[in-house]
Amino acid sequence: MAKLLSFSDESRSALERGVDALADAVRVTIGPRGRNVVLEKKFGAPDIVNDGDTIAREIELDDPFENLGAKLIQQVASRTKDKAGDGTTTATVLAQAMVREGLRNTAAGASPVELRRGMEKAVAQVVDGLQQRSQPVAGDAIRQVATVSSGGDDEVGRMIAEAMDRVSADGVITVEESKSLATELEVTEGMAFDRGYSSPYFVTDADRQICEFENPLILLTDRKISAIADLVPVLEAVQKSGSPLLVLAEEVDGEALATLVVNRNRGVLQVAAVRAPSFGERRKAALADIAILTGGTLISEDRALTLDKVQLSDLGKARRVTISKENTTIVATDDHRAAVADRVAAIKRELDATDSDYDREKLNERIAKLAGGVAVIKVGAPTETELKNRKLRIEDALNATRAAIEEGIVPGGGTTLLQLADGLNGLVEQLEGDQRTGVEILQRALVAPVHHIATNAGHNGDVVIEAMRNSGQGFNALTGTYEDLMAAGIVDAAKVVRLAVQDAVSIASLLITTEVVIADKPEPEAPPVDGGGDPMGGMGGMGGMGMPGMGGMGGMGMPGMM
């Protein structure tokens, strides 16, 4: 493919325009008085959202060079989201301010490399200052963090705090859509483990990169499945039932995995495969725990059970299964509480009998997974659009709360960033030349979040910043007053703030040192195909893979067996 090249100031200006286009769309959402953004969807009603990462992922610009600038800022938002679960808007605002100041100084003749070194020295001091200001989560802090991160929704803050109290901070808390208008909290049987889908082609929600099934059946086996013949009988039975299927095995690969993917993509069967958790004998124990939880039968050689004899009655059942790239959460029904209680009692007896610290640790983990349950926040709203927006806010609040438990909390509302900016004055005096300018770039950027929070609340950002510096207090954008934000319960997770600053500096410092931009040259649109036929001509059946007939699976792309 042909490439387009852009050099020097021209290339950096194009990147900056792309950065500004995306950041200007995202920054209107920052703060408790932030506005919403309407996103057009190819199908269905538009979404109205207040989530920085969701907005950033939707933006695609016509100009290829500007689009690269937008993509770089998308990376800031996505990296912060992946690591902290929140803070994407703050990271975007910080990155935009650094890019703007950095490119302005570069155009004036400053050395991009020295600017970057100055910014890196400054961010190291900012991180140290953040750790010193951080306070551990105690008392009502969980509710406060969740309330602030959800846009000031007290109900969400209360619900997340209650969920963490009931299943512990390390417990499994999921967010799902409710069939009613009310938002409710429910604690049910369930389990989570650190294994993800065997193939990304099982994803059902492309935006969140997860596979989610309602009321699935679960096949549990400690065997490796490579041949599709092993799965044919159970796949036929599940297809007739109309239920989704989760295959939880030692491993699913080769012909078996390929066939599951093909039939999933063709819409013949809702199916996903996940590797079983743990290893060796502990894997069998973990699978047996899941079998008890879901009411299924573990298909194992130890029990003289084989896959080709599996009946629907051998499959486990769950209310919902959510599978990401790295984790799987099973929300069970309440039909097997007594069996789960008996299983926990048996593990406790095993715990009392062992002298090994390692075994005790693993047994305690199994007890926690079985007995801890899953807290489910069911999100309700009058319209589907409002429901999606509210669900995103609750997910952000939950992620921010977990981050707060990890690294503590700091005063919110941009107050901490403003204080950290003023704390860089000593470093500015120590350095000189372009490195000093690099520190000043970060200093000015750290003020940007509170400026935009004030602006979105209808106040003059410069006036608010000056008043905060004079009073030594934070700005409450909800009430328009100056007060001790920590005492008022307006707090941020220190981890979220740290990652927002670090990710923004990382991308901005790379962007200002850019000298050449290379982009794909847009190809002219192809003329329409005459006759409207499918140029691919169809994929045909799975017989082309040389598989033998397997018993009536013709509807799934496989020839029937005689």
UniProtKB/Swiss-Prot annotation:
Provide the residue positions that the database annotates as binding ATP.
T29, I30, G31, P32, D86, G87, T88, T89, T90, G413, N476, A477, L478, D492
Where in the sequence is the signal peptide annotated?
Answer: none
Q: Which domain of life is it from?
A: Bacteria
Q: Does the keyword Transcription regulation apply?
A: no
**Gene3D superfamilies found in the cross-reference section:** GroEL, GroEL-like equatorial domain, TCP-1-like chaperonin intermediate domain
What are the subcellular locations of this protein? Cytoplasm
Checking NCBIfam families in the record gives: GroEL, PRK00013.1, PRK12849.1, PRK12850.1, PRK12851.1
The text of the family note is: Belongs to the chaperonin (HSP60) family.
> How would you summarize the oligomeric state and partners of this protein?
Forms a cylinder of 14 subunits composed of two heptameric rings stacked back-to-back. Interacts with the co-chaperonin GroES.
What is the name attached to this protein's record?
Chaperonin GroEL 2
Q: Which organism is it from?
A: Parasynechococcus marenigrum (strain WH8102)
